[in-house]
Amino acid sequence: MKKYDFETSLDRRNTSSTKWNIKKDEISLSLADMDFKVASEIEEDLKKVISFPIYGYVDISEEWYSAYQKYFLDEYDLKIEKEEMMFSLGVVPSISSSVRKFTDVGDNIVVLSPVYNIFYNSRVNNFRNVIEVPLLRKEDEFFIDFPSLEEAFKDEKTKMIIFCNPANPVGKIWSKEEMKKLGELAKKYDVLVLSDEIHGFITRTGKKYIPFFSVSEINRDISLTCLSVTKAFNLAGIHTSCIFAFNKDIYKKINRQINTDEVAEPNILSCTAAVSALTKGKDWLY
């Protein structure tokens, strides 16, 4: 296994870094951004793209599709068809597009708090209501309050739950049983599950996240999944993400919306970064 340097922290001040665009004596606690180098394999692949001196429009590469397919087949024995995948510039744009497509102004969106603040921003920016269902805590574990969740789902204005899997910021890796129960409740009350799985590639040693859609046929049918390599591989500045949707109606709707919102076309580095991370980054990650 190749050795990587995770001890040297690079000075990112004066590089337009959002994380480090602060005053001299301030401490940056704002973003989940790493300060050591990306995997050298990814760096080299990106350099190859840049070395060709034309930076025009690009299409989604076949390698992009096959890299995600191979990863989930190898890691989870899950077969995903090309027609069940779509490119998006980022998980956050995908969430906002989903909110606009699958809910209306004044509808309710459920979140399990505490959770990533952007989930609230997507609501505010699109004039939806957020219903918080606080997680239950027992010692060092967090659990879903299913009775309270069901009450939130019973409201006829509730159309969606944005589910963070694994949970950010508490780090909870949800069990199959928890996600199966969530899927059954969502099905019962006709609530769409948007599963944000951007942190699925990076978990504690010995702990492996479970894709929401993999738990049951119900979960597969009533959800869409948003994920990206950007958090795990420190590539957030290169806009690249993926959406999985297995229900054909859901697929058609979100595919139309991300195209309407103009977030469905890659930049010149988007596909290469994802392919390199998925096919060459495992040693760096583990």
Indicate where each model-derived feature is located:
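N-terminal small-domain helix-loop-helix segment of the aminotransferase-like
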Residues: 2-90, 97, 280
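PLP-dependent aminotransferase class I/II
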Residues: 60, 222-286
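Short acidic capping loops at alpha-helix termini that bridge into adjacent secondary structure
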Residues: 79-85, 105-108, 220-223
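Conserved PLP-anchoring active-site segment centered on the Schiff-base-forming lysine
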Residues: 101-123, 150
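Short beta->alpha connector loops at strand-helix junctions that form conserved
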Residues: 113, 132-137
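Helix C-cap/helix->beta junction micro-motif
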Residues: 126, 188-189, 219
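Active-site phosphate-binding strand-loop segment of PLP-dependent enzymes
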Residues: 135-207
